[in-house]
Amino acid sequence: MPKEFEHRKCFLCERVETEYNRLEVHHIFQGRGRRQISDRYGLTVLLCHKCHNEPPYGVHQNADTMLLLHQYGQRKAMQEQGWDCETFVSIFGKNYL
């Protein structure tokens, strides 16, 4: 396996990236400028195409999977930035916990 693919796996299913299974960057928070804010705070995850875009479980087709990632992203942001819930909501517009 080429070095560029070592240790990269899907955040949800842990499928390892290969030449034939490329991982895609998913911005945890999107819409109304939140994609750029996600970039700024490192709130992105790598997903295989199936977990990213394929029904029925792909994050863009499944509200439960999306909520799981929103909750993960909120916890990560609050922990890494030292924010309380109110600060998170002031930046991202919603509490997901």
Task: Identify the residue ranges that each predicted region occupies.
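Short linker/helix segments within small regulatory modules
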Residues: 29-44
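Short flanking/linker segments adjacent to small metal-binding domains or redox-active Cys/His motifs
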Residues: 71-97
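Amphipathic alpha-helical interface surfaces
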Residues: 21-24, 43-47, 73
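Short cysteine-rich loop/turn motifs with clustered Cys
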Residues: 1-24, 50
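Short Cys/His-centered divalent metal-binding micro-motifs
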Residues: 44-69
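Histidine-centered catalytic micro-motifs
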Residues: 23-31, 48-55
